[in-house]
């Protein structure tokens, strides 16, 4: 998963006792065996969200009243390493694996491999309907494969346009306008960079997928096999338009000279250091800027001179404000930091922004299917989603939470986030997504070297090879 906003709001989870035993069963039984020992459902999540989901597990444990216990277990921080560890556990039939926090792009692969149980397998018969109730369309679509839900949305994410409000009275609505305004800043020797994710990695694929979807195109058809980058004149035009937009951003006058090596972290720093007038990034940007401004690291936002905010940095050196401090910091930051919808590729048509986030699925290796599904429903309950969003910095997947005043106070951009998630793009749904992503990022890099017509043909060829399972991955 891409750099998460959770790192700016994370709380430590309380570790459960090591004496708890894993859920056991007997080979002759179809259900989950009980003994005097406590049944434990292990929930594997990225290490970067350990505190957030450990806290969610503990809220559920209080609610469960001792019938069984949910234990959060950390996977590595990098998405590719998370996927590899889960795959090894699943192919090795590791019976300690019950619940999986899955990157939204893994659904098709895990479903095809039989690693994730369909939600319709819930013995209680409630999970499939519960996952769809009140769910935003984009996150829900990411949990579906071939018309069936194999996971439930747990958290989500969407990128916004962040801009220097003290320099830009009104945010640009299209990419043409964004590039033009950045070039105007270059001519006046102002901050002219458009900070985004340009190096050869998943972030570059996300950028391309958003621009492609916004232009009316797609990488694959709904069957997960048919490549649709250049198969019709309209699809080819959408692909070329997306590539032309990427090239114009990367080669604009005054563009970031290191754009071929940029990711979420470097984009954030470029903006905070005053080098960028615009930034494409996830909602963690808001808390990051307030934290670093209070520490004196943002030259155009000197919150370090505000004595009422000095206590907003906690003992761990992270942003841990009271409600009053958050409101004060946000009010001050709003003079310099603005947010707006992701710029349109086609004027008058809202961008379709690629979502991030996590889904939660029951692993085929669980010996306690009923308890695992019950745990899944508790972990993504409304109460847990609200706490995960407010305390963990991960946007909620239930649409009604965006009307909650407490949620709105912590997410000033809530209306834009909700609207983009309702009209979101998802990355290509395919069991071969990992190969597709690797090949696409290799073709797109370096972003400054894109030749729209030629690159469109190369992309089509490489994605077709990935789907066909041919050739070495670059």
Annotated model-derived regions:
Residues 104-158, 176-179, 326, 331-340:
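Hinge/lid segment of periplasmic solute-binding proteins
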Residues 251-254, 293-392:
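Extracytoplasmic/periplasmic substrate-recognition and gating elements
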Residues 334-341, 389-442:
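Long, aromatic- and glycine/proline-rich binding clefts that accommodate carbohydrate-like moieties
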Residues 87-89, 96-98, 128-166, 177, ...:
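A structural signal for short loop-to-beta-strand junctions that line the ligand-binding cleft
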Residues 181-182, 225-260, 342:
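Glycine-centered hinge/linker elements that transmit conformational signals in sensory
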């Amino acid at each position: 998963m891409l750099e998460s906003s959770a790192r700016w709001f994370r709380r430590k989870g309380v570790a459960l006792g090591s004496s708890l035993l894993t859920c056991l069963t007997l080979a002759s039984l179809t259900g989950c065996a009980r003994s005097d020992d406590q049944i434990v459902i292990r929930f594997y999540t990225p290490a970067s969200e350990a505190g957030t989901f450990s806290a969610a597990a503990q809220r559920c444990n209080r609610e469960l009243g001792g019938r069984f216990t949910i234990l959060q277990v950390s996977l590595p921080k990098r998405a590719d390493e998370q996927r590899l560890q889960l795959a090894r556990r699943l192919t090795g039939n590791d019976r300690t694996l019950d619940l999986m926090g899955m990157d939204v792009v893994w659904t098709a692969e895990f479903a095809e491999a039989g690693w994730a149980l369909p939600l319709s397998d819930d013995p209680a018969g409630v999970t499939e309907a519960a996952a769809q109730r009140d769910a935003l369309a984009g996150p829900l679509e990411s949990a579906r494969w071939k018309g069936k839900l194999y996971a439930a949305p747990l958290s989500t994410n969407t990128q916004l346009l962040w801009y220097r409000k003290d320099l830009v009275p009104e945010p640009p609505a299209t990419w043409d306008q964004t590039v033009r305004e950045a070039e105007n800043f270059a001519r006046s020797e102002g901050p002219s960079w458009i900070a985004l994710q340009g190096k050869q990695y998943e972030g570059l694929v996300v950028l391309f997928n958003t621009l492609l979807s916004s232009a009316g195109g797609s990488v694959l058809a709904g069957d997960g096999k048919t490549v649709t980058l250049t198969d019709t004149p309209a699809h080819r035009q959408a692909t070329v338009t997306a590539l032309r937009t990427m090239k114009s951003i990367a080669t604009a006058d005054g563009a970031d000279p290191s754009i071929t090596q940029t990711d979420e972290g470097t984009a954030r720093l470029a903006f905070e250091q005053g080098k960028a007038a615009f930034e494409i990034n996830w909602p963690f940007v808001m808390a990051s800027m307030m934290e670093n401004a209070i520490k004196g690291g943002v030259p155009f936002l000197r919150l370090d001179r505000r004595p009422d905010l000095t206590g907003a940095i906690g003992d761990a050196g992270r942003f841990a404000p009271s409600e009053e401090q958050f409101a004060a910091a946000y009010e001050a930051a709003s003079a310099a930091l603005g947010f707006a919808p992701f710029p349109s590729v086609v004027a008058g048509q809202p961008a379709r922004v690629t979502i991030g986030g996590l889904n939660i699925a029951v692993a085929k290796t669980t010996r306690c299917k009923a308890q695992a599904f019950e745990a899944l429903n508790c972990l993504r309950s409304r109460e847990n989603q609200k706490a995960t969003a407010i305390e963990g910095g991960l946007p909620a997947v239930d649409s009604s939470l965006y009307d909650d005043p407490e949620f709105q106070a912590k997410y000033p951009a809530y209306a834009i986030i909700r609207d983009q998630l309702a009209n979101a793009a998802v990355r290509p749904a395919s069991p071969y997504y990992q190969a597709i992503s690797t090949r696409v990022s290799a073709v797109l890099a370096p972003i400054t070297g894109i030749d729209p017509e030629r690159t469109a043909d190369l992309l089509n060829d490489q994605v077709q090879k990935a789907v066909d399972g041919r050739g070495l991955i670059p």
